């Protein structure tokens, strides 16, 4: 139901209703066919059972008349035969249930036996308070193997430094985050932290050092406390509230009827975009990461929400290595260093003022943004 407003705004209720009815009818046809097959199988089993019973009683009756067996023996045999026959008749129903269960189990087994494409064979514990370095990284997504997302990408980031990645769409900025989180591994080159290749480190321990705040934060269908505490190790109420205060979220949470126990709905549908973003920031703060990844965290926010998020980010970024993806250059002017990317490579890097005189691509991006802001 999270897209109900989109359906209503485009006046597509009738079309969605028609599609729903069509899908229900298709499901009904399948269910009716299954019921018919089950009824035929059950009827056939009952027919065989009753036919066998009639034949058995006829033969037994003849034997009683001719004195080969007593009526009591025939009655006992019929009684036990009915019990056994009924048990066999239920096998038709059990067989249908087994067929449905086998289909579901087959899909589950495919998931259970699937192996991760990212091998977690590393045993090293990541170092603390050290530098991050990309060394000649080359990468292409499996779906587009002939289109490199990163090509000879080289970048060094000192501990505690805030670095902003800017560039046109498709420059490879988000791919940098994908590789840092080891959703993929480089095809060539290496990513090193403290001099050690990420592939030599324990995947769980490495990811514990990172917190990601995406452009569209993912919230779960639970309460606010659950969403902020997600991933933390036995957090207390006080710790959750402290994280919310740093994220400038405590104030609006207190205005909700049930406070931190307020149910958010699917994807946090009951909150505004700025409020969802601050919940995601509070989650990142509570995890106390050494590396903070901000993926255009304020690009879709209004002015007031952006101010609150920027204030929270200023506090969070203290003494943490921070990498920021931003299309709005005004949000990263104060970064320690701005790295300009294009076609998967580092084109230039430096502070804002320096890039405005030395990098034509950065100048063009800044000019286009300035014109857009003036037009608005």
Describe the residue ranges of each PLM region.
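Residues at helix-coil transition
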Residues: 2, 9-12, 29, 66, ...
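An intracellular "coupling" helix at the cytosolic face of ABC transporter transmembrane type-1 domains
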Residues: 5-54, 97-100, 117, 140-145
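Helix-loop junctions and hydrophobic alpha-helical segments within the transmembrane domains
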Residues: 7, 28, 108, 242-244
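Conserved catalytic Walker-motif region of ABC-type ATPase nucleotide-binding domains
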Residues: 20, 108, 134-136
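Helix-loop-helix
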Residues: 33-106, 111
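Short, solvent-exposed loop/turn elements at beta->coil junctions and helix N-caps
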Residues: 121-125
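ABC-type nucleotide-binding domain
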Residues: 127-376
């Amino acid at each position: 139901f999270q897209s109900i407003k989109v359906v209503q705004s485009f006046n597509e209720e009738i079309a969605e209703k028609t599609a729903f009815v069509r899908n229900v009818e298709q499901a009904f046809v399948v269910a009716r066919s299954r019921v018919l097959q089950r009824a035929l199988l059950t009827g056939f089993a009952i027919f065989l059972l009753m036919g066998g019973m009639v034949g058995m009683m006829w033969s037994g009756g003849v034997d009683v008349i001719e004195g080969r067996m007593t009526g009591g023996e025939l009655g006992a045999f019929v009684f036990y035969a009915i019990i056994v026959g009924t048990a066999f008749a239920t096998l038709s129903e059990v067989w249908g249930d087994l067929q449905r269960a086998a289909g579901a189990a087959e899909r589950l087994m495919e998931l259970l036996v699937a192996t991760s494409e990212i091998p977690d064979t590393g045993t090293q514990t990541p170092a603390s308070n050290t530098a991050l370095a990309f060394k000649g990284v080359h990468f292409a997504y499996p779906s587009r193997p002939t289109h490199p997302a990163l090509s000879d990408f080289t970048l060094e980031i000192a501990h505690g430094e805030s670095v902003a990645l800017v560039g046109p769409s498709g420059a490879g900025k988000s791919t940098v985050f994908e590789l840092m989180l080891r959703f993929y591994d480089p095809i060539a080159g290496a990513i090193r932290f403290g001099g050690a290749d990420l592939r030599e480190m324990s995947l769980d321990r490495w990811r514990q050092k990172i917190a990601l705040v995406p452009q569209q934060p993912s919230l779960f269908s639970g309460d606010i406390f659950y969403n902020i505490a997600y991933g933390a190790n036995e957090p207390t109420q006080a710790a959750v509230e402290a994280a919310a205060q740093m994220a400038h979220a405590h104030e609006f949470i207190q205005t909700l009827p049930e406070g931190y126990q307020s149910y958010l709905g699917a994807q946090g549908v009951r909150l505004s975009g700025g409020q969802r973003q601050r919940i995601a920031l509070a989650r990142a703060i509570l995890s106390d990461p050494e590396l903070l990844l901000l993926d255009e965290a304020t690009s879709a926010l209004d002015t007031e929400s952006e101010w609150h998020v920027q204030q929270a980010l200023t506090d969070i970024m203290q003494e943490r290595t921070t990498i920021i993806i931003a299309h709005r250059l005004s949000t990263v002017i104060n970064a320690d260093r701005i790295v300009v990317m294009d076609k998967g490579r580092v084109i230039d890097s430096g502070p804002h003022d320096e890039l405005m005189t030395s990098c034509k691509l950065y100048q063009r991006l800044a000019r286009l943004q300035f014109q857009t802001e003036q037009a608005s």
